[in-house]
Amino acid sequence: MARYIGPKAKLSRREGTDLFLKSARRSLADKCKLDSKPGQHGRISGARTSDYGTQLREKQKVKRIYGVLERQFRRYFAEADRRKGNTGETLLQLLESRLDNVVYRMGFGSTRAEARQLVSHKAVTVNGIVANIPSQQVKAGDVVAIREKAKKQARIVEALSLAEQGGMPSWVAVDAKKFEGTFKQVPERADIAGDINESLIVELYSR
């Protein structure tokens, strides 16, 4: 399946919440009706969504937030289910530990898509080694940095400036002057922001 490249606002409207696909710092709430489905007539009044439909929508929402396609998402779930602990929480932790997401959380990219592009274009290093696989799992203590030749890119400078104003997650430590950050630890569920009900995804795959 090809990656979606259409209007990002349409995806947020479809899920009824801002997925922050355009910017982590600027909400779409003032720009479009998030409570109205995309299309000429929007949401059909009176239509009731089944339990399966609700579970499926939640899975689609999380896939879109993290920019992961179906086959890869299934692999993440299988790995989460294999590990000890809460499957839903572990699933989110695996997604949050992706290199493209960590680059985004550290403020080097204004969106996950932009962060993914930085990784793919070899603008990022992990522990001093160039990394170009967005799905690479970052471990506690790993140092993620922007390569010297990419530090002057306006989009990176602007994204980092906005991230500093908005505040960084507690599980990363960023040195903005050096364009590098440390992945301090895998985030706990309470530290993962976003309107996500991962238990619905567990229920879906448990059918």
Curated annotation (Swiss-Prot):
InterPro entries: Ribosomal_uS4 (IPR022801), Ribosomal_uS4_bac-type (IPR005709), Ribosomal_uS4_CS (IPR018079), Ribosomal_uS4_N (IPR001912), S4_RNA-bd (IPR002942), S4_RNA-bd_sf (IPR036986). Residues 97-160 form the S4 RNA-binding domain. One of its GO terms (biological process) is ribosomal small subunit biogenesis. The keyword Secreted does not apply. One of its GO terms (molecular function) is rRNA binding. Keywords: Ribonucleoprotein, Ribosomal protein, RNA-binding, rRNA-binding. GO terms for cellular component: small ribosomal subunit. It comes from the Bacteria. Part of the 30S ribosomal subunit. Contacts protein S5. The interaction surface between S4 and S5 is involved in control of translational fidelity. One of the primary rRNA binding proteins, it binds directly to 16S rRNA where it nucleates assembly of the body of the 30S subunit. With S5 and S12 plays an important role in translational accuracy. Belongs to the universal ribosomal protein uS4 family. This is Small ribosomal subunit protein uS4. It comes from Burkholderia pseudomallei (strain 1106a). The lineage of its organism: Bacteria, Pseudomonadati, Pseudomonadota, Betaproteobacteria, Burkholderiales. The gene is rpsD.
